[in-house]
């Protein structure tokens, strides 16, 4: 049985106070529910025991006169005697709401968001972009004076955690002038044009060892065809193996939720790029995904992205949409690996459906993570995506390619 050691920091001063002793509950949600959704700002709600009045904003308690809005928050956990804790969330306080159900009780709930919310509060105004690959365009947006997203330092330290992780793209974006457009809206369009992803990542990619400067909350740009982070984890029935943690529940989807037989993609100023799966259309009808006003320079890149998508999702498949884990019920070694999981991690899941005789194995990518934590319990939910194909069809790796499947789509 794992025994997590928590450190919940709220930056009321230097050093950052640890408020763990007063925490009644934490809810964290990061990433997205499914592969077609845009990545949303991660959120964290921390409920604090405020019986002593310690956290009442503008009150007479210990932190009453402190700044609340905009201060940094970190949710860290140490497992398996690790040298450095794993970050489940790093972000900033948006609201601090006090509740007084009677004369003797009080709670304060801190509502927090991560770096995507920071981008959502800025606007790109009268900016000229050169023709450049997507990753260069992304950096140019972040470095624009009106956005000013924190830079990634060359040598991360405990005081200066790294904030960016940007893949090098080969997909060219057209030169453009952007006038008065929300930064988050523009970056969502950039991610679609890249056929990649932009998200804030918590945890530790691929289950790597946590360094001193790895505090989570890292803004990622994933290029087209980017592989998942290989974790080596296989979720299944009861097991004590460090790389085979048990799950408590598994959800699947099968049907029209991810079923498209036609795609219409178009870059700004370009012609419609239309792909139709003529073999599947007579069976499932015309089901169209439309993406217009993409930022690409070349129609060929747009057509490739459209083809990748249609031929991945033109027939229904049994897909695992999520798995649930109870980290406290795992071994220390298992819990440490599971706690590090975040968006874009690659995992396997094995399960035997009710009434079936043989176990199925699926290769999955993590799309979102939810933590629900109380002093005596911890539930973790992973939102996942995958092709729906069995692992025995895998070509080269469990996260990067499937025999006779187009592996280039998300």
What are these regions, as identified by a protein language model?
Residues 110, 137-140:
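Hydrophobic alpha-helical membrane segments, chiefly transmembrane helices and signal peptide h-regions
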Residues 120, 142-176:
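N-terminal export/assembly leaders
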Residues 4, 82-84, 151-164, 229, ...:
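Acidic Ser/Thr/Pro-rich low-complexity disordered segments
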Residues 1-132, 169-178, 184-185, 189-195, ...:
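Assembly/oligomerization scaffold segments
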């Amino acid at each position: 049985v794992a025994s997590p050691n928590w450190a919940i920091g709220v930056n009321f001063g230097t050093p950052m106070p640890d408020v763990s002793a007063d925490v009644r509950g934490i809810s964290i949600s990061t990433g997205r529910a499914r592969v077609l959704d845009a990545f949303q700002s991660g959120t964290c709600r921390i409920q604090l025991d405020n019986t002593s009045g310690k956290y009442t904003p503008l009150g007479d308690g210990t932190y009453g006169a402190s700044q609340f809005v905009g201060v940094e928050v970190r949710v860290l956990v140490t497992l398996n005697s690790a040298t450095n804790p794993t970050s489940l969330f790093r972000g900033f306080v948006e609201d601090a709401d006090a509740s007084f159900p009677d004369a003797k009780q009080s709670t304060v709930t801190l509502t927090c968001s991560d770096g995507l919310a920071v981008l959502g509060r800025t606007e790109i105004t009268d900016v000229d972009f050169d023709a450049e690959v997507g990753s260069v365009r992304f950096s140019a947006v972040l470095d624009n004076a009106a956005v000013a997203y924190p830079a990634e330092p060359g040598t991360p330290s405990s005081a200066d955690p790294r904030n960016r992780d940007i893949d090098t793209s080969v997909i060219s974006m057209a030169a453009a002038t952007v006038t008065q457009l929300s930064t988050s809206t523009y970056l969502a369009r950039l991610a679609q044009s890249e056929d990649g992803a932009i998200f804030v990542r918590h945890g530790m990619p691929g289950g790597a060892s946590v360094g001193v400067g790895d505090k989570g909350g890292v803004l990622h740009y994933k290029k087209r065809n980017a592989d998942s982070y290989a974790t080596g984890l296989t979720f299944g029935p009861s097991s004590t193996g460090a790389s085979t943690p048990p799950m408590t529940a598994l959800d699947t989807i099968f049907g029209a939720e991810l079923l498209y037989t036609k795609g219409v993609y178009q870059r700004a100023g370009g012609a419609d790029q239309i792909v139709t799966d003529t073999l599947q259309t007579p069976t499932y009808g015309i089901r169209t995904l439309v993406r217009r006003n993409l930022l690409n320079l070349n129609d060929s890149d747009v057509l490739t992205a459209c083809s990748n998508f249609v031929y991945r999702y033109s027939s229904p498949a049994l897909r695992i949409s999520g798995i649930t884990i109870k980290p406290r019920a795992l071994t220390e070694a298992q819990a440490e690996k599971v706690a590090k999981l975040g968006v874009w991690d690659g995992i396997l899941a094995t399960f035997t459906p009710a009434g079936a005789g043989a176990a199925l194995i699926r290769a999955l990518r993590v799309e979102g993570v939810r933590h629900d934590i109380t002093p005596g319990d911890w539930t973790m939910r992973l939102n996942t995506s995958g092709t729906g194909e069995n692992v025995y069809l895998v070509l080269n790796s469990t996260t990067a390619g499937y025999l006779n499947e187009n592996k280039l789509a998300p």
